[in-house]
Amino acid sequence: MRSPVYRGAWAIAVCAIAAIMGAGSPASAQNPSYPQNPSYPQGAPPQDKKDKGAQPSDAERQAATKVTSAADFNAALQAAGEFVKKHPKSSLRPEVTRHLVAKAALNQDTAQQITMLESALGVMKDPPDAEIINPSILDAYLKAQKFDDAFRVSTAILEKNPNDLVTLTLMAIVGIDQARAQNAKFVPQSLQWAPKAIELIETDKRPPHLDDSQWAEYKTKLLAQLYQALGVYAMMTGDFATARTKLDKSASINQYDPITYVYLAGVVQEEYAKLAQQVKSMLPGKTQDETLKKALEKMDQMIDLYARAIGLADGNPQYQKVRDELAGDLKSYYSYRHGNSVEGLQQLIDKYKKPQQ
């Protein structure tokens, strides 16, 4: 059985995905992130919630105003330190903490932002303060690719709130992205958090802070990414049956992600390779013919999946290298199955292009 050169399921997937990870930024950059912290008007005192205990005194308000009116983060941090020293139980404390986070967010330098937020944690030391600061510092750690710190903070967040869907989803995907980049340190957490996130989404446990459009994204794009991540890890461990199940599920939820089809093609290619090897070891006859037929059916599936991935990637610069990587393989397989001709190949690709909206 002379057929196109077999490159291996994981090799195919890795080469294609490397094309979109080549810039060095984590794949999590496209994944869920925490809502931006609110900013407060300069000099405006934070407003306490009426159901959060005693009304603040004038002294508390004045101390809080020193934080909000501070010229820069360092001045605000110093004022916040004075505030918590004098009024540690104030109902304004959460809003003072949020203001520090908002001040830090104004700095566009991620390294400086991390330093600021870590300093804020050093001053605002109560557990409720950390609950306010941690989401922002987690986001900053991820931007800086400080993954050890990011998973440390994530663990703290989830110990306090095990059903924090944003953290579960984000970090499950990031952990498997890291495994794909040869850093398997965070796989145990990811394999624990991804199923939990899937369960929360599929049972419609919508977090109150997500609006309708955000929740719709979780139920489609992000749910699909979670299944895709689990499928990727199954491929990495050689469990191609599980990988196929997870990736098929991902594709059924979001049919427009070309990367899912790249991975599925890798799984099918592994199935094809096994059948092709069996054909080579068989004597001519009915059994060999039947096995050959099955192998060619797998090749046809690969052709379809490659065409789908290339079609869906059309027009998106992010996926140009993916298209280039797959195009040669697709042409080779297609021409093998069509008498050394590529007639009709472009029409097949065009069929799978994403409809214009």
Region locations from a protein language model:
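N-terminal leader/linker segments that initiate helical-solenoid repeat arrays
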Residues: 27-100, 104-115, 123-132
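Bacterial N-terminal signal peptides
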Residues: 11-23
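Short coil/linker segments at helix-helix boundaries
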Residues: 74, 111, 132, 173-221, ...
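Short coil/turn linking the two alpha-helices of tandem helical-hairpin repeats
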Residues: 67-70, 104-108, 143-145, 172, ...
